[in-house]
Design a protein with these regions (language model features):
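Histidine-centered catalytic/metal-binding microenvironments
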Residues: 541-649
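Carbohydrate-binding surfaces of carbohydrate-active enzymes
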Residues: 503-522, 604-611, 617
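Contiguous, structured surface segment used for ligand recognition
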Residues: 1-143
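Aromatic-lined carbohydrate-binding surfaces of glycoside hydrolases
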Residues: 16-20, 38, 48-52, 63-69, ...
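Short, surface-exposed acidic
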Residues: 44, 516-523, 577-578
């Protein structure tokens, strides 16, 4: 039934017609959630213009309402801001663009007590509420322009679409699909790589992957998100060599093609047999032209792409050593390529913006070449070799960039070392830029409590503006919610408002995810995280002296003592909380055994340690069906296979 006038017709939502799918979706989401939390029907009406005599909630753009706080003409295309002015369940929900209108709807629901602690319906915490009793007034601009996630890990279509759906609920505005078809990420899931207990699906192929990407794009577009695409593969696709992943190419390469490859150690061939790791002879104008033709063709066929990533190879110390290439730095040749690409796009009236990457050898800035049209480009800083035990907040100063020696580079390991390259680039490029980082690619697996890595991403994001960056795109596994989504929530909320308190966000998250025992759970996670930070699974050379034996014993004791709290809550009355506690129960079992294996490895009892690790793998393989929405088993096994293969901790 339609809710009657106890709220003075606040049970009606008016959406001002813009023929925009994102605004319409925002209105539908508001109706759906309000009906869930009020147990009443909510009417949805379309209107041509605002009429303050009509009671209820009004959804539209700032231009639809009198006295809008926005100066729309001054707003950058990708910047987000929201405006909510609701009193007694009536008023305005607006945003500076359609995407921001959707953010405003979710923010309004957040103020009513709704929370989304992980992707999927079982991650929704929806309290009962009477919207007529609420006054919500919010006027905010996002702290950073770029707030995104990049596909990585092993994924199903549902994992991806659930993630996209969840992202806008907490303030992310961009999604990046690597490669043209994201084949390898889907293949890892559908062929169950790293889980021998599951059989490959048998019907997965490249065409299926392309269909999945098309469906994911529909979800991105429905929400008005910034769509980023490709990155890898531009150095091989122009020559008919398919680069779907980091696997070796099985066919012969004819000399007409290999003449364009980088000359390394006297040979022009695929670098280590891997197409996407192979650089080209960038001083060769024909090689550049072939790349540019391929990129321009793709851009012309895909106008839906907002930010097109144009990267070189994913290898390093493999730059061309021919007599022409050695006269210029790799970055000088890269900027020359970018300028020629801009010329080609401009000639066809294509306005797609291009993301260029500073990474590996390209960390060293150009010496001579300059961007002719910097507004076309966005700089992506990718400090993949950095430590995740230090944040950008610890930087007191940066040193000069070391000299560049072709094919003899040592990549920086410290945060300061990486940022020194960023600063050098910023002296040559004054345009838009963001951090492309990897907190939840590998490092999160080494922090079972997730609190340290969550605080690290918080500190990094809070200080992005201090190192001249306007956002953050996280290259990461999509299922980084095990034991929970604290880190992902902190990432999104801090990107929206860098002044938020980590402690307050953590307390709110744990209360929303776990209920009344959330504070106990947070304390447990903090202690587990701190103990594993002391053990330091990242780098042996960076370890402090700690009593490792006591550390391991404290971990066992901590998990054992907390098991009774898990058991008490495993059948919690709230379905969202119950699922959170079930995940935590599986997590405790896994990490009890993981700790045994790591302790044995630390003591040098390698054979016994490997035996425990094999048992843990069997445990996670068997449990994958119960926690696959939150836990990337493929990634977990890969990270710890590497640690145990070293046969020392």
């Amino acid at each position: 039934m339609i809710r009657e006038l106890d709220l003075l017709q606040a049970g009606c939502i008016h959406v001002i017609e813009h023929n925009d799918q994102t605004i319409n979706f925002a209105a539908q989401e508001l109706v759906r959630y309000l009906e869930a939390i009020t147990d009443c029907g909510i009417a949805l009406k379309s209107a041509e213009q605002y009429d303050q005599r009509e009671k209820g909630l009004w959804i539209g753009l700032p231009c639809d309402f009198p006295h809008s706080p926005f100066l729309v003409d001054e707003q950058e295309e990708y910047d987000d801001a929201l405006w909510i002015d609701v009193s007694g369940g009536q008023g305005i929900i607006s945003g500076v663009n359609p995407r921001s209108v959707l953010f405003s709807v979710y923010r309004f629901l957040n103020e009513l007590g709704c929370r989304w602690v992980r992707p999927g319906a079982d991650g929704e915490y929806l309290p009962k509420a009477d919207i007529g009793s609420f006054t919500v007034r919010v006027y905010e601009h996002a702290s950073y322009r770029y707030r995104g996630i990049c596909i990585e890990g092993a994924v199903s279509l549902e994992h991806v679409t659930d993630m996209i759906d969840w992202m806008t609920k907490i303030g992310f505005n961009s999604y990046f699909i690597q490669f043209r078809e994201a084949y390898f990420f889907f293949e890892r899931w559908y062929n169950h790589l790293n889980n021998p207990l599951k059989l490959p699906s048998g019907d997965f192929n490249v065409e299926v992957a392309r269909a999945y990407v098309a469906l994911a794009k529909q979800e991105i577009q429905k929400r008005g998100m910034i769509y980023q695409a490709v990155g890898h593969g531009w150095t091989c696709a122009p020559f008919g060599i398919v680069g779907l992943s980091w696997e070796k190419w099985g066919d012969e390469v004819d000399p007409e093609t290999s003449q364009f490859f980088a000359l390394v150690n006297g040979k022009r061939e695929l670098w280590q047999g891997i197409p996407i790791n192979t650089d080209l002879c960038y001083s060769n104008s024909e090689a550049r032209s072939k790349m540019i033709e391929e990129i321009v063709l793709y851009a012309s066929l895909h106008p839906e792409v907002d930010l097109l990533h144009v990267w070189l190879s994913d290898g390093f110390n493999n730059q061309c050593e021919c007599e022409q290439c050695v006269l210029m730095s790799p970055s000088d040749l890269y900027v020359r390529l970018m300028n020629e690409l801009d010329e080609g796009l401009t000639a066809l009236g294509i306005e797609t913006r291009i993301v260029f990457l500073i990474y590996h050898e390209l960390l060293w800035p150009p010496e001579y070449e300059k961007f002719i049209n910097p507004d076309r480009f966005v700089m992506q800083f990718a400090p993949i070799t950095r430590s995740y035990r230090q944040s950008f907040s610890t930087i007191e100063g940066v040193s000069d960039v070391p000299p560049f020696f072709r094919n003899k580079v040592d990549l920086p390991q410290t945060v300061e070392g990486n940022v020194s390259f960023l600063k050098a680039w910023q002296s040559r490029f004054k345009g838009d830029s963001f951090d492309f980082d990897y907190h939840f690619m590998w490092a999160h697996q080494r922090d079972p409590g997730y609190v340290h890595i969550s605080r690290m991403v918080y500190e990094d994001i809070r200080h992005l503006h201090q190192i001249g960056l306007n956002g953050f795109v996280s290259c990461q596994v999509q299922r980084a919610f095990f034991p929970n989504g604290l880190g992902m929530t902190v990432m999104a909320r801090t990107l929206w408002n860098k002044e938020l308190s980590f402690r307050e966000m953590a307390e709110d998250y744990y209360a929303s995810a776990y209920g009344e025992d959330g504070p106990l759970c947070l304390k447990y996670a903090e202690e587990l995280s701190e103990l594993y930070f002391d053990l330091n699974l990242e780098k042996e050379t960076d370890r402090n002296e700690v009593d490792r034996k006591s550390c391991f014993q404290n971990i066992y004791s901590l998990i054992r003592q907390f098991e009774c709290v898990i058991e008490k809550n495993i059948h919690h009355a709230n379905p969202c909380h119950a699922v959170s506690w079930r995940h935590l129960g599986i997590h405790a079992e896994i990490w009890t055994e993981m700790t045994r294996g790591l302790e044995l490895l630390d003591r040098g009892e390698v054979e016994q340690a490997l035996c425990i690790w094999e048992g843990v793998k069997t445990m996670v393989w068997k449990n994958e069906e119960n926690c696959h929405r939150v836990f990337d088993v493929y990634n977990f096994v890969g990270v710890f296979d590497e640690i145990f293969s070293v046969k020392a901790l």
